[in-house]
Amino acid sequence: MTSKQRAYLKSLASNLDPIFQVGKFSLTPELTDAIGEAFNNNELIKIAVLKNCLDDPKEIAQTVAERTHSQLVQVIGKKFVLYKPDKDKPKIELPK
C-alpha cells in the first residue's frame, strides 16, 4: 500500500466510529472471528482499545491484521483502522 493510498483511507476512516472494543481480556478468538466476519460487510473498520486493556494497541493492531488477513492503516492512541478489500466487488477505490 502506498502512502497516497494510506492517506486516502485515513481520510475515509476519520468519520468512522469504532465498531469493536478490545477490553481487559484483550484479543479473544471470538473477537478476532467477529472482526473477520465484519469484513464481509465493511472494507474499512475502526477498533478501539479500552483503558482497562493492558496490552499495547500497536501490538494488538498488528495481531488482528495478521489473523484477519487485513492491512493496518493507522494506529492513533488507543484506536486503530484496518482495511481489507472485498474480493468480488471492492467498494473503496484506492488512488494509484
Which residues make up each language-model segment?
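Positively charged, polar, low-complexity stretches
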Residues: 1-96
